[in-house]
Amino acid sequence: MKLRTRKASQQSSPIQTQRTARAKRKYSEVDDSLPSGGEKPSKNETGLLSSIKKFIKGSTPKEERENPSKRSRIERDIDNNLITSTPRTGEKPDKQLSRVRRKSPVNGEAGSYEMTNQHIKQNGKLEDNPCSGSPPRTTLLGTIFSPVFNFFSPANKNGTSGSDSPGQAVEAEEIVKQLDMEQVDEITTSTTSANGAAYSNQAVQVRPSLNNGLEEAEETVTRDIPPLTAPVTPESGYSSAHAEATYEEDWEVFDPYYFIKHVPPLTEEQLNRKPALPLKTRSTPEFSLVLDLDETLVHCSLNELEDAALTFPVLFQDVIYQVYVRLRPFFREFLERMSQMYEIILFTASKKVYADKLLNILDPKKQLVRHRLFREHCVCVQGNYIKDLNILGRDLSKTIIIDNSPQAFAYQLSNGIPIESWFMDKNDNELLKLIPFLEKLVELNEDVRPHIRDRFRLHDLLPPD
């Protein structure tokens, strides 16, 4: 039985070999005809049916290649349109764009602006790139210098201390106008009344000292002050009769001493403010001299000044401004002499970012000015910044303040020495003229207020009740 089986296996081996070879060839043909889409294998076909199947087989993978379900990370990074916040035109930059974040001028939300889309001009003025799709960036100067004063009128003289007037909202705009309209003499500083009309602060302050007659004063009025009632025609301009009729009335309403007369009293909270200065030491002089900065010791401008003594940049509201500084004649001589007998305190209504940097240049070692106070130390009364000397924590009987604006020391009029505003006069000697009187006050070693009151008689300039 076994022998017969062995013979059968030996005899069938060639036949089995042939069958295996045929099966391999047949499997190879079927494998070549398998579709890539996973369809069932079929026999080789010819004719119309074969052509249709070939067309289907060839188009299906092509659609998949055109719309792949996933892309590699490298392919996604090439498409920059997926990561840009604003559309760009033109060629793409070779290097990565630098971005800055700033508050939106409309609603205060933070937004990203590409600095490559704009060209920065001098003092923060920006020029839009015509090839950019980003929104233009707007800037506002604000008030880094001492703000101008808003005078009281009968409509708002009963305001409370610390309340803001409507004019404060357009304060920055008026400062910008002042800088743009700065003349050669540079003595025009505009203010804003409660109803938004612009008035010349400097013209009001200097007018009592003018000796050129009423015609020159009227010319100043017609140039700087718009009429309140008289209509304006292109042929006639402002009515001269109206200027004559209302000159004294305007002077009474917008007199700085009218402002002082009707300034509201300090609130309980303001009276109890914590002193901003440290206690005196043994080396501190007994008397304190408070000095204003702008138009008292220096004159600064954002417009380029050919005769500027120094210039420096200031970063304010994300914009860099170049500040040009003129020093008042005898500025350093005055400080060097007074610092030997007085505790010099600089008290300005300007922003700290500007005033502090300027003082670091003028007095880097703080040998002349011992302390510095800024706008945040002032009292805001209807948009006006007043320097209340109580914040010093010093004996007011031995404290003196020098300021070109009498309104600044409205709460301590007997401690204040007014000085003429300075802008560019190289022959000015007002600082030198004050030295003998200041030295005498120290020698007397008495209450300085009666002597200041008798010398400058500012109370006599207040309007009657």
From Swiss-Prot:
InterPro entries on file: Dullard_phosphatase (IPR011948), FCP1_dom (IPR004274), HAD-like_sf (IPR036412), HAD_sf (IPR023214), TIM50 (IPR050365)
Any Pfam family hit: NIF
Modified residues (Phosphothreonine): 86
Domain FCP1 homology: 282-441
Summary of the function given for this chain in its UniProt record: Probable phosphatase.
Family: Belongs to the CTDSPL2 family.
Name of the protein: CTD small phosphatase-like protein 2
Organism expressing this protein natively: Mus musculus (Mouse)
Classification of source organism: Eukaryota, Metazoa, Chordata, Craniata, Vertebrata
